[in-house]
A protein has these predicted regions:
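Transmembrane helix-loop junctions at the membrane interface of multipass transporters and ion channels
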Residues: 6-7, 77, 163-180
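Single conserved hydrophobic/aromatic residue that forms the stacking wall/gate
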Residues: 1-5, 9
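Membrane-helix interface motif
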Residues: 73-95, 168-171
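Soluble-to-membrane junctions at the N-terminal ends of transmembrane alpha-helices
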Residues: 3, 42-70, 105-121, 136-160
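Juxtamembrane helix-loop transition segments at the membrane interface in multi-pass membrane proteins
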Residues: 30-46, 132-139, 210
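Transmembrane alpha-helical segments that form the membrane-embedded catalytic/substrate-channel core
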Residues: 21-29, 33, 122-135, 160-164, ...
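Membrane-interfacial helical/loop segments at transmembrane boundaries in membrane proteins
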Residues: 83-108, 178
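Alpha-helical transmembrane segments
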Residues: 10-26, 109-123
Length: 211
């Protein structure tokens, strides 16, 4: 496993710069551009002893982080033991079967597999940005989207366009190769489960549902 992991790390220096840009700069710009919500004025003042990261926020950050790491670790293990040229070959049984298989890989991770891994990683963060938008609002992530289309929506589009351009044209600079349109569609649809799970949880916690 260590040889496969080191191969990934050596290839991901410029990729991680892009990921940091997404998670820090772009995400901050997207969330800061959201229109003001009058409901904030109904909340009681926060105590001076309150932490910036509340317990619910910390629980969500830790929980999502653990799930992402667990899934991506399994994906890396799967790619290590399977020769994947398209996600249409993906097998749940193969994914689960290779999860704890620490034997030496039969082949090195291919540039295509590494490009798939990189894109899955980025789009998991992309969809989770929508969950961050709706955090503690008890509303859908799509609520008031029309009012934030020029800010949040524009940044979201910039992230998607940037990821496509990097993977398609980044070449040796980003250690990537172009993905097929089929794989782009599968990654977009598959990683979006992060958003839909968040929507389901928010629906269960909404005042209307509780009543």
């Amino acid at each position: 496993y260590s040889s496969a992991a080191s191969d990934v790390y050596k290839r991901q220096v410029t990729q991680m710069l892009w990921v940091n840009l997404i998670m820090d700069t772009f995400a901050a710009l997207a969330l800061a551009s959201l229109p003001p919500d009058e409901r904030v004025m109904r909340d009681p003042p926060r105590k001076t002893t309150d932490h910036i990261i509340t317990r619910p926020m910390g629980r969500d950050i830790l929980g999502v982080g653990i799930l992402f790491v667990a899934f991506l670790f399994g994906l890396l293990q799967y790619f290590k033991h399977a020769d994947i040229t398209s996600l249409t070959q993906f097998s749940v049984s193969g994914y689960l079967g290779s999860y704890l298989d620490f034997s030496s890989p039969e082949h090195a991770l291919t540039p295509y597999e590494l490009s798939l891994f990189f894109t899955v990683f980025v789009l998991l963060q992309f969809w989770n940005m929508f969950n961050a938008k709706a955090f503690n609002t008890h509303r859908s992530a799509f609520a008031r989207m029309g009012a934030s289309i020029g800010g949040f929506g524009l940044v979201a589009l910039l992230i998607l366009a940037g990821q496509y351009l990097i993977v398609t044209f980044g070449g040796k600079m980003f250690n990537v190769v172009p993905l097929s349109w089929t794989d782009w569609g599968l990654i977009l649809a598959g990683t979006s489960i992060v958003l839909w799970i968040g929507e389901f949880i928010r629906m269960l916690g909404s005042p209307n549902h509780k009543s």
